[in-house]
Amino acid sequence: MNIFNQLKQDIIVASRQLYNNQEIANTATIEIPKDSFNGDLSSNIAMIIAAKESIAPREVALKFKEVLITLPYIASIEIAGPGFINFTIKADSWQASIKDILQHEEKFFEIDIDKSKNINIEYVSANPTGPMHIGHARGAIYGDVLARILQKVSYSVTKEYYVNDAGSQINDLVSTVLLRYKEALGEQITIPAGLYPGEYLIPLGQILAKEYGNKLLTMNYAERFKIIKSFAVEKMLDLNRKDLADLGIKHDIFFSEQSLHDKGEIEETVKLLERMGLIYEGTLPAPKGKIHEEWDNRVQKLFKSTKYGDSQDRPIEKADGSWSYFASDLAYAKDKIERGANHLIYVLGADHSGYVKRIEAIVKALGKEQVKVDVKICQLVNFVENGVPVKMSKRLGSFASVQDVNHEVGKDIIRFMMLTRQNDKPLDFDLVKVKEQSRENPIFYVQYAHVRTISILSKAKELMPESYNNFESGKYDLSLLSSEEEIEIIKLLASWTKTLEASAKYFEPHRIAFYLINLASKFHSMWNFGKENSDYRFVIESNKELTLARLALASAIQKVIASGLEVIGVEPMNKM
């Protein structure tokens, strides 16, 4: 029995019985109180009903208490504050969740929230002009883990990378590769400021020289540009794909910005918005304060972005008449919606925080308020060693590439550590602590818990083979798991799917990492109690019945930790 789901269903039934209202009860929450003094679970149903029916919340809460106290798994109910209903659950109901994890594993870990949602999540979208830096990695991992979580709760999810292969940065890439090509032909070159001086483009010049000889130099500009651009963008994308693959990340779609231009989708989108009355000719307001020299006060085509909450309307054309980057964003959102997405998620870096309102405006307009949009910002990553900031130019190269850091610490450590802070908060990545075997290193602490549970089961199989066979046959008495420490762990295990649902609801993958750290901490504490008091040991040869129950507990911990690590794309370790 999933206690959280069961209580929610019983509250819905009670709401229908007491107030003939099931629909509003669906919006009620079942939460774990921050203070255990307030019981095991808490619901706000009384306050929701009270607001709807214009009744005092405590009066509503008391009526719910009369009905719900009769449920066989409820030990007690208390009314707190303005009308929160706090529930204490009977121990045997918590203990039964261990059996659900072990004997009905597939059903316990299965979550089905809403299969009608078709989510498109765009993340990384780094310019294809060079190796990915570690700042990209945070957004990449956040987006990838969020996609995994959303898939885990049964949403249909498309993972997308928007390839910025149109615009000035691509022109600069082509110019740089052309110079490297000339260099490969024996010409002395100088890379001008503003281009890409990195040595990673040298092999591209060499490949072109080998394939074309000096033929590219005799071609007209347009033909040469087309060849070099196609070649360079594809090679840079291959590099980015490898960087991502090394982090365990694979997108479903790499969508080309250039394709929007080539297929006329930008023109089509602008015409649609004109028919909707959302494009007009006007001037942008002057920046606040003194007049800026860069302010463009010409009459131009503008999108009515302010109608949808943006701070200003947005230009869709540049001064030279070409489409603006914003115009590409309009066409790209339209394309996603036409492909069937009804919820768009954009994962952006800290340097794009100013794009949030304009992207929301785009989707609200093109989705006609029927398509949901969320824009998530990933803040910066600061590298430290034992808490002391590291200058990346001296430590891991000029821009701390993903390859550098991956080589230094490994994929699993990077993935886990990127989730140890909420995405919109800066993250300190300690290059020393992440390799320590101590509780100060969260990924080690969690992996060590997984290894220990396997060690417990192996030890029992070796020392008590008959008892171990009984455990595998499901012959254990879970009522023996009655200590405060055991019940605390069991409650946490039972809340795993609740944590997963919350992570999906609020787009917060860090909740998974926090949960695993908390579970590992409680398990290690109980393990350490066993060093001081033999009654707390998991394998007690003189007490077969208690050992059987604790083997069930250890196995449940192992399965939940493995499930959590799998969700965030980290491979559980079986030995250290």
UniProtKB/Swiss-Prot annotation:
It comes from the Bacteria. It catalyses: tRNA(Arg) + L-arginine + ATP = L-arginyl-tRNA(Arg) + AMP + diphosphate. CDD domains: ArgRS_core. Monomer. The gene is argS. GO terms for cellular component: cytoplasm. This is Arginine--tRNA ligase. It is an enzyme of class 6 (ligase). GO terms for molecular function: arginine-tRNA ligase activity; ATP binding. HAMAP family: Arg_tRNA_synth. InterPro entries: aa-tRNA-synth_I_CS, Arg-tRNA-ligase, Arg-tRNA-synth_N, Arg-tRNA-synth_N_sf, ArgRS_core, DALR_anticod-bd, Rossmann-like_a/b/a_fold, tRNAsynth_Ia_anticodon-bd.
